[in-house]
Amino acid sequence: MSERTLPDDLVELGRVASAYGVKGWIKVQPHSAQADVLRAAKQWWLAATPKSAPRVYAVQQCRVHGATAVAQLEGIADRDQAEALRGATVWVSRALFPAAAEDEYYWIDLVGCAFYSSVSGSDVRVGVVEEVFDNPAHAILRVVCQDAEGKALLDAKGRAREMLVPFVSAHIQAVDIAARRIDSDWPLED
């Protein structure tokens, strides 16, 4: 364990579920089905509570174990030390993520992108991607609808209007992470 400057691009990727074995390994429940980022990162930041500052740990070894990842962290040498980390959130710097394959995206990169629809042949800015979540078939974008000034459009009950859009090639025409833009042919809702 060491003290380093806290990166400003930390992304929460999982939670320590328990100790694993007697040699200080921990078992991490990832927030997504893929533990590739956890396995590839050589540094993790762990936060014991939501209000505590994360502390950096060097990852000595990590491997996928079913739906979890198990890891050995520098400075954690026995089961008691590993058990003390139970419940801690696991964070990784976005800069340490491996490059995504072509036409694949990290969900964290999609959040905040402007969402456009081109149903009638012209691009219309619908809103901003607020969240990405999974269903059994594919990922879903939750888009908060906005006016031309970027203010949320409200429904009859005063709540922000939203659209749920399947993140599939049949409806998503282009994704430009650098420009923070997603183009689609998803129909506009009235």
Curated annotation (Swiss-Prot):
Primary location: cytoplasm
Family classification: Belongs to the RimM family.
GO cellular component: cytoplasm; ribosome
Gene: rimM
Source organism superkingdom: Bacteria
GO terms of molecular function: ribosome binding
Function, in words: An accessory protein needed during the final step in the assembly of 30S ribosomal subunit, possibly for assembly of the head region. Essential for efficient processing of 16S rRNA. May be needed both before and after RbfA during the maturation of 16S rRNA. It has affinity for free ribosomal 30S subunits but not for 70S ribosomes.
GO biological process, one term: ribosomal small subunit biogenesis
Localisation per UniProt entry: Cytoplasm
HAMAP family: Ribosome_mat_RimM
Location of the PRC barrel domain: 102-190
A Pfam family the protein falls into: RimM
Cysteine-cysteine disulfides: none
InterPro entries cross-referenced by the UniProt entry: PRC_barrel-like_sf, PRC_RimM, RimM, RimM_N, RimM_N_sf, Transl_B-barrel_sf
Keyword Cytoplasm found: yes
UniProt remark on domains: The PRC barrel domain binds ribosomal protein uS19.
Subunit note: Binds ribosomal protein uS19.
Keywords from the UniProt entry: Chaperone, Cytoplasm, Ribosome biogenesis, rRNA processing
Protein name: Ribosome maturation factor RimM
